[in-house]
Amino acid sequence: MVKRRTAAVLPNNLPHLQHLVKKDPKSYREEFLQQWNHYETAREIFLVNPSSDISEFCSLIDFISQTCNYYHDVTADFPSELIELLQKNHTIFPFELCEKIVLCLVLLKNKTVISPITLLQCFFPLFRENPTRGVRELLYQQVSLTIRNANKQAKNDKLNKAVQSALFTLVDGSGSGSATHTDYSGQKREYSASELSGVWAVKMVRDLWKRNVWSGDARAVNIMKSAALSSNPKVMLAGIYFFLGADNQEEEEESDDEGPDVSKLLHQANVNKKTKSREAALLRARAVVKKKERGKQNVPTNVNFPALQLLHDPQGFAEELFEKHLASSKSRLSMDQKLVVLRLLTRLVGSHKLTVLGLYSFLMKYLTPHQRDVTQFLACLAQASHEFVPPDALEPLVRKIADEFVTSGVANEVVCAGINAIREVCARAPLAMTPDLLQDLTEYKSSKDKGVMMASRSLITLYREVAPDMLKRKDRGKLASIEMKDRTPLKYGEELNVTHGIQGLELLAQYKAEHGEEGENGDDWDNWEVSEDGQNSDDSGGWIDVDSDDNIELSDSDEEEEKATARKESDEKGSSSQKELVDRMTELASQSILTPNDLKKLEELREQAGVDRLVNGPKRSLKRPDDAVEADEIEGPRKKAKNDREARIASVMEGREGRDKFSSKKAGFNPTSLSNKRKQRNKNFMMIKHKLKGKAGRSLVQKQKVLREHVAREKRKIK
């Protein structure tokens, strides 16, 4: 009886029926079949007349999507019908119906009625065909959410490959034709296929890379590589900005939010007064730190390589970028867009040490002080310089910068930018500089302008490290002059800042040679050396046999010969000690195992050598060749220009707005003086304490007398 009364109201109450079906599917099968027949009838009517009311149809779709998993025999074709309905009629359906069908398909995927690949295969063609922005945004959100959920527990390579293939097709299909669609403002406009789908595909790859779903995935990098070579400017710029920004993404995320300093808060809690608000702040800070630590522990195990390092063919990519966007006469990019392409190209050349010789001749015409954004071009030139670029290709550029920027008749800022640009180029390719030009540029070390002086001295510091023989003798410095004897001249193709073997091992070898082997480990090492080499330990100490004193003849009259002989003996002794140190270092590296004590001592010697280097040597370390160069590094320190009279007056008047005049605050409020009662109230306590003391000691008669006088005064006021 109860069921019959409930069933009487069910056809008009789908949420109630949905609840009952989920509780007891077998008992309400007939009611479900009734709604299924309503759905089929409404679908046929709606296909014939799409302008009819969609509210009832949307309700039926939602109801069947929620309950279809309980009646597989009836609803087996329901997902395919929804997919077909959406794919064939998405351009004529209203947005509300498209949204309902999309959400129902996502619900079916969550109920495992359809697979994620089937869902994505339905959605991706709509990116290219549907002109409605709202539908594309909805599809983008659902596709991105589906991919993130599928990769939450572990990498779903099968799904990722299918999605990346579809995205690659969308990006690579730029120029596959165009179609006329209604603009968002209601006007007709030509949209290419890449404009409709390529931008969304690039946006999705960038978002999934940022969320660490596809970070470090080479296939995602290939998609963005194809986007950077697209003929559509929007897709091209999105792909280029991905490569320019993905390298520093992890560093930016770490530096943006450092979090609270718990040690500082603990110190403040011990010193300051304890209050509830400070205790709550400390608890919140601890909670934030614990949350960050848990986040670091749950980081995915895949390594997030920089996007530029994951390119399959960087040389071919660089050449294609240059030929398509910069060197081609068919390129219609603006100067700002070309500059963005140039930033990526030079970053690619410097990072992978590629050779694109046409790039340097392309940059030649932009290296003038009057060129707009010239510091950007100078930074790009520095990024594109490395050891494997022929000096003949870079030397004309360095000479032109010196002739255009470092000359008389230009501002000090221009000279500073020119010398800084030359320094950045030569830091990566020292052979691009000639000795004559270097010595001319070092003359600016005594300039009165701070920026020019610092730029010139930084150039001197650089060549003290890499090639002190190119500097004048007075500019080499003591340490560089001493090291010149053992330094080999720079050669073309010789890499800079490359550590061979164990860094600082020569320091440990020198320490062991000076102090000897101590302790049991040292004795064991000496015994092992004797048994291995078959030589006496005294002979292995590096002693040099000399002749007896009888064979030495001294001439008091020839002092020059004595000095020459002493200098020769000193050189022989130095070369012998250097050879002994090299042999000792070779033995340590090849025939011994470094103990924990050795490693600890090696670390101490490295730190000490670093301190000595900072005290006695250059203050600036060489930059790595793959470091990016910013325009601010080229401009150098800039002196703030003085304001003219109009600017100073404007600044003064701006500061006066909303401010009272400098005058007494009492003036103008009340022209009359204060009453005696108010003055008495504002007097200092020390001035009236004697009167108050007498007032407190009055007798009852005196108090009555004062009270009668007060009453009489009040009566006189009333009259």
UniProtKB/Swiss-Prot annotation:
What protein does this entry describe? Answer: Protein sda1
- InterPro entries attached to this UniProt entry: Sda1, SDA1_C, SDA1_MD, SDA1_N
Q: Which family does it belong to?
A: Belongs to the SDA1 family.
In residue numbers, the region (Disordered) covers 515-583, 614-682
Main subcellular location: nucleus
Record's compositionally biased regions (Acidic residues):
519-536, 546-562
Task: Write out the biased-composition intervals (Basic and acidic residues).
Answer: 563-583, 635-663
